[in-house]
């Protein structure tokens, strides 16, 4: 246990273009090696591509994609008398968003398009339509939780 007080949560400032706090947080997930300007260029470029292809509000599609990716339950390992059980637990709202953003960025990086902005745009549009690798990951996590429902009485 730490001897000090728990550090206060810092507020993330809204992003300058769309005024969205969740988009600003997403940019921090895209950012590598502290290069925020590069991350902004990638995210705004991806949202422009989405706007071009879908002819609708890109922020709306972004939020729809995050909802499609965010998991409701996950499994955590719990050791009971020499055996390790995968115990399904509900995901806190803040963790839901964090996982959704992380998966979105990870699977966008693995795509085959030329630039990161194109990859991110592709993954966003796929996720908003309920397909894509990030949505598959969510379904896999839900399937694992469903399969281990019998161990849910080992709550944390």
Curated annotation (Swiss-Prot):
Tagged with keyword RNA-binding: yes
CDD domains assigned: uS7_Bacteria
Record's keyword terms, sorted: Ribonucleoprotein, Ribosomal protein, RNA-binding, rRNA-binding, tRNA-binding
Gene Ontology biological process terms from the UniProt entry: translation
Gene3D superfamilies: Ribosomal protein S7 domain (1.10.455.10)
Signal peptide: none
The keyword Cytoplasm appears for this protein: no
Gene Ontology cellular-component terms listed: small ribosomal subunit
Pfam family, one: Ribosomal_S7
Entries under InterPro entries matching the protein: Ribosomal_uS7, Ribosomal_uS7_bac/org-type, Ribosomal_uS7_CS, Ribosomal_uS7_dom, Ribosomal_uS7_dom_sf
PROSITE patterns membership: RIBOSOMAL_S7
GO MF term (any one): tRNA binding
Matches recorded under NCBIfam families: rpsG_bact (TIGR01029)
Function: One of the primary rRNA binding proteins, it binds directly to 16S rRNA where it nucleates assembly of the head domain of the 30S subunit. Is located at the subunit interface close to the decoding center, probably blocks exit of the E-site tRNA.
Subunit composition and interactions: Part of the 30S ribosomal subunit. Contacts proteins S9 and S11.
Family statement drawn from the similarity comment of this UniProt entry: Belongs to the universal ribosomal protein uS7 family.
Name of this protein: Small ribosomal subunit protein uS7
Organism: Pseudomonas syringae pv. tomato (strain ATCC BAA-871 / DC3000)
Encoding gene (name): rpsG
């Amino acid at each position: 246990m730490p001897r000090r007080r728990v550090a206060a949560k810092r507020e993330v400032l809204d992003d300058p273009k769309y005024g969205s706090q969740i988009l600003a947080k997403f940019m921090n997930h895209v950012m590598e090696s502290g290069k925020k300007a590069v991350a902004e260029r990638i995210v705004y470029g991806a949202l422009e591509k989405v706007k071009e292809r879908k002819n609708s509000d890109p922020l709306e599609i972004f939020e729809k994609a995050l909802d499609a990716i965010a998991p409701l339950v996950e499994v955590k390992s719990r050791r009971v008398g020499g055996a390790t059980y995968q115990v399904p637990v509900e995901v806190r709202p803040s963790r839901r968003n964090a996982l959704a953003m992380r998966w979105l960025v990870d699977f966008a990086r693995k795509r085959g398009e030329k630039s990161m902005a194109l990859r991110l745009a592709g993954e966003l549009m796929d996720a908003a339509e309920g397909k894509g690798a990030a949505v598959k990951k969510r379904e896999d996590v839900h399937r694992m939780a469903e399969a281990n429902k019998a161990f849910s009485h080992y709550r944390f």
